[in-house]
Amino acid sequence: MTNLKAQKRLAASIAGVGINRIKVVEDYIEDVQSSLTRDEIRNLIKDGKIIVLKKVGISGGRLKERRKKRSLKSEGKKSGSRKGKKGARANSKQMWVKRVRKIRAYLKWLRDHKVIDRHTYRELYLKTKGGNYKGVSDVRNVLIQMGKIKG
């Protein structure tokens, strides 16, 4: 076998790929061996006497299949795989909306059952909107302090 190391190196440099992706067609080995300049090598690549192979990737098909099966079973999502806190993983806006809805429902129930008057309701409602209360229990504590309900 003839030594085409220099020609392959030049072809790789011209094509911008590694040496392993350069292949010389068997019928044109003599032509390639006689060419020494970058211009000659460039012409050989154009003529198809030197072939630049396509990049070989890694197939992700099997991995996708495995991941899909795991996601269908909800694997890898339980407490052992979680690194962040609940607040880091959950959408903070959704958490806020959920909390505010609970508090508002509680306030509405209190107003409808005549536990608090509409002025107190409005005051607490606006404070809830402003983010004063962490939850329903916080609102209960405030109402106990106000003397509106018994502890």
UniProtKB/Swiss-Prot annotation:
Q: Does the keyword Ion transport apply?
A: no
Q: What are the boundaries of the region Disordered?
A: 62-93
Q: What does UniProt give as GO cellular component?
A: cytosolic large ribosomal subunit
Enumerate the InterPro entries for this protein.
60S_ribosomal_eL19_sf (IPR035970), Ribosomal_eL19 (IPR039547), Ribosomal_eL19_arc (IPR033936), Ribosomal_eL19_CS (IPR023638), Ribosomal_eL19_dom (IPR000196), Ribosomal_eL19_dom1 (IPR015972)
Signal sequence segment? none
User: Which GO BP terms, alphabetically?
Assistant: translation
Q: Which UniProt keywords apply?
A: Ribonucleoprotein, Ribosomal protein, RNA-binding, rRNA-binding
What domain of life does the UniProt record list for this protein's source? Answer: Archaea
Q: Which GO terms describe its molecular function?
A: large ribosomal subunit rRNA binding; RNA binding; structural constituent of ribosome
Q: Which family does it belong to?
A: Belongs to the eukaryotic ribosomal protein eL19 family.
Q: How does it assemble?
A: Part of the 50S ribosomal subunit.
Q: This chain belongs to which protein, by name?
A: Large ribosomal subunit protein eL19
Q: Gene that codes for this?
A: rpl19e
